[in-house]
A protein has these predicted regions:
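Cytochrome P450
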Residues: 1-377
Length: 377
C-alpha cells in the first residue's frame, strides 16, 4: 500500500475508526491481539477509573471537540513561548554530564527532556517524571504491541496507578485552578457546562504523557545516530544550525519514531483491491508511505536538501495528525542546537551501545546509545 492509499485511509474516519473497541468504553491498553484478558488482569483493571474514547481513540465529532480544547495550549504560538524553558532544560541536562567523557544519550538526555517538559506543561511535579516514563512505556506497549499475560498485568497496574495519581489532581484543579494545561482542560466550559468529564480527561492525559515523551525521545535518538554515522552532515549542522529543522524533518520521514497506528473497519470495503471485512484491524503504515518512491525520490537516501513536495507522515496524517507535532519539532530542534553548541568530537561507542531496535511493533528507536564527546571550550 503506497502513500496515496494511506492518505485516503487516514482521511476516511467513517470507514476506518480510530476506536479499536466497538463500544463507547475507552482503550484498555491490553495490546492488539484478540486473546481474551485473563481474570487476574481483569481484577486489577477493575480498580481503574472508568474512561471513554477520547482524542486519539475517538472519531469526529467527539475527536474534533477534544482536539479543539487542547489545540490552544499546543498551537505554534503557544509552543514557541516554551522555547526559553526547553532550552534551559537542555542546558541543565548537558551540565549534568558535560564533565564526563561519554553520555548515555537516551537515559541522560533524550528521555528526561520531553518528560520534564510535559510535566511542566501539565503542571505536575518534575520529581515524578521517571514514574511517568515507567507508566508511559507500559501503556504505549499496551496500545500498539502484542502482550504476554505477565506484560498485561504490568500494564494494568500502570493504568490503575496513573488513574490514582491524576484523579485527585483533577479534583484539586476543579477547586483551585493553576496556570497549567491540566487546569485549562479541567475547567474548560461549553455553554456554561464542563467541557470534559473525568472519564474523558484521563485518557487525554494518558495520551499527552505517552505521545509527549516517546516520539521526541526516539526522534532525538534516531537523529543523533544519523549524525554519528555522517560526520560531514554533523559538521554542516555545526556551521549552519539553521539547517537543523530540515534535518529533523528528514529524520521524521526516513526513520520515523512512530511507524504505524491502528484503525478498525466499521464496514466492508477494500484497499487497493484487497477486501477488508467489517471489524478488521487495519494498519496505516506511515513508514511505508514515507518510503514510497512515487512520493519521495530515492526514499532510502537521507537527504536534508530533499525537494519540497509530498508531506511526510512522521506525525501521521489527516484528522488525527499528532496534536503535539509542533512541540516535538521544537524540542528536537533545541536539543540538537544545544548538543552541537556545547559539545564536539562526537563518536559512537559501539561496544557499549545496544543498537537493536526497541521491542515494539509500532515505535521505532534504539535500545541504548552511548556517545563519546568533548566539551566545547
Amino acid at each position: 500500500v503506497g502513500y496515496d492509499a494511506i492518505v485516503d485511509l487516514a482521511k476516511n474516519t467513517a470507514q476506518y475508526s480510530s476506536s479499536i473497541t466497538e463500544d463507547e468504553h475507552g482503550p484498555r491498553h491490553m495490546g492488539v491481539s484478540s486473546d481474551p484478558v485473563q481474570d487476574d488482569v481483569e481484577e486489577i483493571l477493575s480498580h481503574a477509573h472508568p474512561i471513554v474514547n477520547a482524542l486519539f481513540t475517538a472519531d469526529p465529532p467527539v475527536h474534533t471537540r477534544h482536539r479543539k480544547l487542547i489545540s490552544k495550549a499546543l498551537s505554534p504560538r503557544s509552543v514557541r513561548a516554551l522555547e526559553p524553558q526547553i532550552r534551559e532544560v537542555c542546558h541543565a541536562l548537558i551540565d549534568s554530564f558535560v564533565g564526563n567523557p561519554q553520555v548515555d544519550l537516551l537515559n541522560e538526555f533524550a528521555i528526561p527532556l520531553p518528560v520534564t517538559v510535559i510535566a511542566d506543561i501539565l503542571g505536575v511535579d518534575r520529581a515524578d517524571m521517571w514514574t511517568f516514563k515507567h507508566w508511559g512505556d507500559l501503556m504505549i506497549s499496551g496500545n500498539i504491541d502484542v502482550l504476554s499475560h505477565e506484560k498485561r498485568r504490568d500494564v494494568a497496574r500502570a493504568v490503575v496507578d496513573l488513574h490514582n495519581y491524576f484523579v485527585p489532581r483533577i479534583e484539586q484543579r476543579r477547586i483551585t485552578p493553576t496556570d497549567d494545561l491540566l487546569s485549562e482542560m479541567v475547567n474548560a466550559q461549553i455553554d456554561g457546562e464542563p467541557a470534559l468529564t473525568t472519564e474523558e480527561l484521563l485518557p487525554i492525559i494518558d495520551q499527552i504523557l505517552l505521545a509527549g515523551h516517546e516520539t521526541t525521545t526516539n526522534l532525538i535518538g534516531n537523529g543523533m545516530l544519523v549524525l554519528l554515522n555522517d560526520p560531514a552532515l554533523m559538521t554542516r549542522l555545526k556551521q549552519q544550525p539553521d539547517d537543523i529543522p530540515a534535518m529533523v524533518e528528514e529524520v521524521l520521514r526516513w526513520d520515523a519514531p512512530i511507524q504505524c497506528t491502528y484503525r478498525r473497519a466499521t464496514a466492508e470495503g477494500s484497499i487497493n483491491g484487497v477486501p477488508i471485512a467489517k471489524g478488521s484491524m487495519v494498519i496505516p503504515a506511515w513508514a511505508g508511505a514515507n518510503w514510497d518512491p512515487k512520493a519521495f525520490e530515492n526514499p532510502e537516501i537521507f537527504d536534508i536538501d530533499r525537494p519540497t513536495g509530498k508531506t511526510h507522515m512522521g506525525f501521521g496524517y489527516g484528522p488525527h495528525f499528532c496534536a503535539g507535532a509542533e512541540l516535538a519539532r521544537l524540542e528536537a530542534r533545541i536539543a540538537f542546537e544545544t548538543l552541537l553548541e556545547r559539545l564536539t568530537d562526537f563518536s559512537l561507542d559501539r561496544e557499549a551501545s545496544d543498537l537493536t531496535r526497541i521491542a515494539s511493533f509500532a515505535a521505532q528507536g534504539y535500545t541504548r546509545v552511548i556517545m563519546n564527546f568533548s566539551a566545547r571550550t
